[in-house]
Amino acid sequence: MSVVNFYGQLSNTQQFDQIRINIASPDQVRSWSFGEVTKPETINYRTFKPEKDGLFCARIFGPVKDYECLCGKYKRMKNRGITCEKCGVEVTVSRVRRERMGHIELAAPVAHIWFLKSLPSRISTLLDMTMRDVEKILYFENYVVVDPGLSILQKGELLTEEELQKAKDKYGEDAFTASIGAEVIQQMLKELDFSKLKQELYDELHITSSEVKKKKLVKRLKLVEDFLESENKPEWMIMDVLPVIPPEIRPLVMLDGGRFATSDLNELYRRVINRNNRLKKLIESKAPDIIVRNEKRMLQEAVDALFDNGRRGRAAKNANKRPFKSLSDMLKGKQGRFRQNLLGKRVDYSGRSVIVVGPELKLHQCGLPKKMALELFKPFIYSKLELYGIATTIKAAKRMVEAEKPEVWDVLEEVIREHPVLLNRAPTLHRLGIQAFEPLLIEGKAIQLHPLVCAAFNADFDGDQMAVHIPLSIEAQLEARVFMMSTNNILSPANGRPIIVPDKDIVLGLYYLTIAFDNEVGEGMMFSDLAEMEHALYNKFITIHTKIKYRRDQLNAEGKMVPVIIDTTYGRLMVGELLPSNPNIEFKFINKQLTKKDISLVIDLVYRHCGQKATVIFADQLMKLGFKYACSSGISFGMDDMVVPESKSTHINETQLEIKEFEQQYSNGLITYGEKYNKVVDAWSRCTDRVANDMMKEIATPPVNDYPNHQKINAIYMMAISGARGSFQQIKQLGGMRGLMTKSNGQIIQTPIISNFKEGLTEFECFNSANGMRKGQIDTALKTASSGYLTRKLVDVAQDCIITEKDCGTDKGIEVKSVIEGGEIIVPLAEKILGRTAAIDIFHPVTNDLILNKGELINESKLEQIESAGLDRIMIKSVLTCESSTGICSICYGRDLATGTLVSEGEAIGVIAAQSIGEPGTQLTMRTFHIGGAATKGAEVSSVEASYDAKVKIISRNVVINSEERKIVMSRNCELLLLDNNGNEKARHKIPYGARLLVDDGDMVIKTQKLAEWDPYTIPIITEKSGKVLFKDMVEGISIRDVTDEATGIPSKVIIESKQYSRGAELRPRIQLLDSKGEVITLSNGLEARYYLPVGAVLSVEDGIQISVGDIIARIPKESTTTKDITGGLPRVAELVEARRPKDHAVIAEVDGRVEFGKDYKSKRRIIIHPIDGTMSIEYMVPKGKHVVVNEGDFVKKGDLLIDGNPVLQDILKVMGVEVLANYIVKEVQAVYRLQGVKIDDKHIEVIIRQMLQKVEVTDSGGTTLLVGEKIDRHEFDEINAKAMKNGLKPAEAQLILQGITKASLQTRSFISAASFQETTRVLTEAAIAGKVDKLRGLKENVIVGRLVPAGTGYFMDKMRKAAVKLDEENV
């Protein structure tokens, strides 16, 4: 017996390893066929039997009934294989009607519309004609010259009827040959000699210099090579014979009313057959040319409509004016074959029902209604009933089950025991949306769900439904139990934190239980055991909140029990009792008021130190305790719990005064409208926060009153602070003031809502708030779809990313450090490196001890060593640098977040990454509406304060002292560092240009001391010398104009875009500084004092006045701020992973060098950078209106911004390389999610980036057959180069290119996967011509062809099968 067969008989789908797609030749089509369809008839309207030679002919396609010929002469199995001599039908199973094909011999050749119209058109590219011209020939509009003969006509020239006639008159009838229709195209394609053509194209490519021509040649050359390699013949793109698909796939069914419903394809086929038969008759009867030609055109159109209706001209429509569904439409889109039937199938043994909460279930259980269980487990019940002899036959068993006899229920109980079922809640956004549970039979009709798994399913009990699926085979049950059991999915795969976390009322109950009140009954009593305390509690000597002392035995590090006395309360001890005993889990973790965060932390600790079983038991008990006390606490809230602070009116009055002042400044012309708007918005933001803070203080301190049973703590406050429900944002609106509202476009309305919900809103306020609320509702509706689409694209691009080996052996890695923003450490280093592996040996900086070996996993204990060593950056391995040829290795990926151990081989990390990024996107878009449109925007940062006592260090300090003796920063990249006594960096702040420095290098500062301040709403332009102002190129009305503010009537001079006027095109508005002699002053960097002003700048000086150092000559207003929420965020994530050019993108410097402004070109400014190493200078052309952030003579580093904005990803890759690009994308994507408090591990984003960097673009072909500009897979490129070097040829060179995820998915190695994603026809056309082979490596293609996916258990089956095949080959 061969080794392969040891793994069970291989099904059909597993007997092949790859699939190849080709263009079908006419001979192939005939060989598939079982006969020619010559009649358009379908079935006889009286007998309902298929017509002979028609579209449903039984002779061609097989019998209609199993083992029965059409006339009924032969029936039953005994005659199988006989062909009836009367009706010609073979006696066999009727299933063959799904498999057997027919064909139609076409009377005239017809072009295949996919190769003609799918862009770029393959036929026209090969013939080097335009598509319009080819169409004109095919649809009988123009003739084409095939052989110019003795005439001066060109080969391939098009002629109309008249031109042809003229040419014939001029040169004679037989002097040249011109022809029309598909025949001539077929002939031209036949005449192509590919090997010769290839050489010609190669030669031409080397001599041509035009880029456009090169591109065209490369395209054609690529196509020619495809044809050569795939052994397709080009004339096969024109068809002589048309395949007819099996009749069962285009069925004709009888409806109740005696009418028929038919597939559109039948109608389309009928048209083809009718026109074909008519054409045959016309040719036979030698009809006039014009009639034959018209019929040929009609035939071409009929075949077009069959293949791809509507692709060319008007779509063929049925009687109800609906276009017919053609063969292409059957494959395309969500309802097409790929997505509807191959990737997603409806399954048997499933049911769905409403869910209700099941608080008494254990974590691994779910309640299944008896009715559902009976239906789902029917086959199992039948076999058991028969086995026990309760029922004699299956039929008897069936009757018993239908009658619901008592024995049936006993059998059901037994069948169901330990047989896991899968529960799924749509939408399944990540893998935790399907989990396995052991069913418990319950009465009623609703499924019971354990409360702790709701977070993973994102389920609530307001009418949600869930589906139940039954794993049937023993392997499926095993997988369900081992991988999918809810108890095995405690940690979230997105961030490695527990996802089985108490929520809502459990949190509230636990918070209430662990509160300690002052002056409770029996405060300070001592206890030594719990029974004693219960006694005291029962007799009302203490309450659960009384502060008491307690002697508790605790495990120390040596594992011995030691008694300790702790200050605690009875409630906290009850939680403490549930803790598993472990020296690492100390009582102090729960000896406090437990909020949701604390509980999550404790569950995490228990999981890390005590393992999974202990965690599950602990979580379950915690839940029971929480529910109990949430109930007995009797927490509820009423109107009086919403406290409106006394100080509210004072704050509002103060702010209104402030705003009056801004209005005044504005009317006096001191500030622009934009500045006023920003200041007003800021003032109100601050006011809202102050009111909210006062309200929080009042809520947090309970009112003193005389009722003995009065609730000691505000219920609303308790719900929010414990993390049970609601946020301070919402409470602020209940009792503070609602604050500023946003318009639907994200702009903030200047007048805030001063009332809160308790006082009630005025009509006007209500109207204003409706705006923002509506935005939330609309967002939710629109964004959910786009988020789902993003997830789908991510899954598609990453689906073939699988862990394929333990270690790829690379030495590369990436350097990570903590994320610092605004001087605060937002993400500590620890968070970024936990669960990754070290790329190099890591030593202690002081003692030089080895902390980590290269390739060692960084776990919690190693983290502590790294933190105590004070390391601030570390080299870790990353999927970006992994060198596995297919998939990724475990070491580069690191820890599998869902288990906390090193990731195992066969794990589908790509899909997990896609889900981790996509799932929160969907959640977040649904979350906007809870706040109801209240603007959430922090006041603008306008100063920097010291966050520590420290020493100041200033980097790139370039300062001038102005007339007020203030230090003004003149450098564009000034940074202020705070250092501790050892010189370690504690904080880093960017100080903007034009800021006032309040400290200097080397100063010692104390915490909260102000270090620098600036105007946050404008970018100033500052002088560094004193002198006299001279305006240049400021022409009133062309480059500058007085803008009079309507509200104030005060004019100010503003620079405007001058290119609308012919004489304005050359103007470059600038200010020059002159010395006393009238000469232009020279600055410290040796350049003249000229200040160029961008469009929109507001002048602060007059022509001819004297100014001093550090004065502001002009201000550039910043745009008014809009609120940031995930709606700004989700499109931002999409923009990043699609690698789109951002709107108003930044321009970055490609080298280190000095900046010079060159001569302008039309409406563009020219920025030149002279590199320090004296190489060629680089020019950048930027639109004039853009604000350039560098000045003439500034020194810029490689990668610095020259123009503000978001940089283009492709530029970062080109200039700074992969690591910087990856860091940037990770940082930007994380920033979006961090804003919403969502945690995603960096490695997931890195996986997606790796998939975006799969391709390289050839820059030099060397000795290989690659073409310059060709885009090819990284690994394929390496393989080709390895071959070339082996043969002693020069290897090709290429550069990495970044592709958006949509493009990357469409260009995967697998055409099946690409076709099922988008643009199905284009992908299949391309694949067929190139004769592509799909190796079936990813998940999607395997699902489509119906095999186990090569991930998880399927990965090992696949591996073992391949090994077995190898063994068999060796044995042979």
From Swiss-Prot:
Zn(2+) 2 binds at C808, C882, C889, C892. The gene is rpoC. One of its GO terms (molecular function) is DNA-directed RNA polymerase activity. Pfam families: RNA_pol_Rpb1_1, RNA_pol_Rpb1_2, RNA_pol_Rpb1_3, RNA_pol_Rpb1_4, RNA_pol_Rpb1_5. It is an enzyme of class 2 (transferase). Binds 1 Mg(2+) ion per subunit. Binds 2 Zn(2+) ions per subunit. One of its GO terms (cellular component) is DNA-directed RNA polymerase complex. This is DNA-directed RNA polymerase subunit beta'. Its EC number is 2.7.7.6.
